[in-house]
Amino acid sequence: MILDYDVILARYGEVAIKGPSVRRRFEGKLLHNIKSAFSCRAELRHGRIFIFPEDMDEALDRLSKIFGIVSFSPAVTAETGFDSIEDSLREYIHELRSEGLLTSRTPFAIRCRRVGEHDFTSQEMAAFAGSVVVGEIGAPVDLGNPDLEIHLEIREDETYIYHRVIPGPGGLPAGTQGKVVALLSGGIDSPVATYLMMKRGCQVVAVHMDNAPFTGEEAEEKVEKIAAKLAEYSAGVEFKLRTFSYGRYLESCRRGAPEKMTCVLCKFGMYHLAEMVAEEEGALAIVDGSSLGQVASQTLPNILATRMGVNIPILSPLIGMDKVEIENLAKRIGTYDISVIPDGGCSAVPAHPSTASPPEAVMEASEKINVKEEVAEIFRKGSKTRIFS
């Protein structure tokens, strides 16, 4: 027999410590995002979000991808009172036993949380509930290190019984911190950087550079799949992918500048194009997947050189992370398996790229190939745009 859950209790973290006006705004946005993710009724009660979904399985899957939620629990509802709680708890623990989660040898604990006025204390109800479990199953009580915790969340007229506490992604509700332009490739790093800024409440306009003929169609297909995966974390907020034809600019870099500077000038142009997109989209910052020292364009000298002349913040949330940390996060959020699909790479990458391009040399090369005009022309021609919502 499967537990017949009728409600989900969702908890939020950072939102709760904001000032009253900010908290109300964030709570309202979180409710909106939940209702946008799946069909449900959702309401705030005493620091919890109570969710009544039409499809419980769908709701549990989608809640794990809604930023602002730190954990959630599917629960069954009982009337508040010893007799009603006893009846519901007996049924609940027998279903736990039928699922193999509770036996006569399973150390367990009752965790009771109470809100409102009642004629009993939390400790009294926990002791009573524990005696019900012992009487029915014969399981041993272990408050210090139980294998199973059964929770009673008691409100004025209703009590919620649950044993699962499922982690949420945490962070801030999507759409509460403004808009950013994220440079998105088919690699491992930039999707993770984009995810981390989404986790901090940012709405994302993803910008991808189509480097054809130096890259193949496989690279573009990967980016579409990565964007779709990231959009799963953007319930309630539009996720936009804009793809620009960038190959002509790369060809100009290879023709008009030292070959070893190709990667630096490529990144230099990306930032300037992203700044134009940010102005058009009303975004306040650029995001990229730079991790210090990982590739030629991400050494400190080259980070300095590639960002010259850009007048809005460039945020690099991965800057202090190593490759293993980034890969582990990519696996957790579901982008890793897409990113590692072979796509042929970029044939414009030189055999020996510069790792320390002097800023004055980069500026001289950028003026020689007229980067600003090249990039402006790419921007004027527009982008292929796809919206995920």
Curated annotation (Swiss-Prot):
Record EC number: 2.8.1.4
GO BP: any one term: thiazole biosynthetic process
Stretches assigned to the THUMP domain: 57-165
GO cellular component, one term: cytosol
Keyword list, A-Z: ATP-binding, Cytoplasm, Nucleotide-binding, RNA-binding, Thiamine biosynthesis, Transferase, tRNA-binding
GO molecular function: ATP binding; CCA tRNA nucleotidyltransferase activity; tRNA binding; tRNA-uracil-4 sulfurtransferase activity
Record keyword DNA-binding present: no
Positions annotated to bind ATP: 183-184, 267, 289, 298
CDD domains the UniProt entry points to: PPase_ThiI (cd01712), THUMP_ThiI (cd11716)
Entry-linked Gene3D superfamilies: 3.30.2130.30, HUPs
Annotated compartments: Cytoplasm
Catalytic activity: [ThiI sulfur-carrier protein]-S-sulfanyl-L-cysteine + a uridine in tRNA + 2 reduced [2Fe-2S]-[ferredoxin] + ATP + H(+) = [ThiI sulfur-carrier protein]-L-cysteine + a 4-thiouridine in tRNA + 2 oxidized [2Fe-2S]-[ferredoxin] + AMP + diphosphate; [ThiS sulfur-carrier protein]-C-terminal Gly-Gly-AMP + S-sulfanyl-L-cysteinyl-[cysteine desulfurase] + AH2 = [ThiS sulfur-carrier protein]-C-terminal-Gly-aminoethanethioate + L-cysteinyl-[cysteine desulfurase] + A + AMP + 2 H(+)
Pathway participation: Cofactor biosynthesis; thiamine diphosphate biosynthesis
InterPro entries, sorted: Rossmann-like_a/b/a_fold (IPR014729), ThiI_AANH (IPR020536), ThiI_fer (IPR054173), ThiI_N (IPR049961), THUMP_dom (IPR004114), THUMP_ThiI (IPR049962), tRNA_STrfase (IPR003720), tRNA_sulfurtransferase_ThiI (IPR050102)
Family, as annotated: Belongs to the ThiI family.
Record-given protein name: Probable tRNA sulfurtransferase
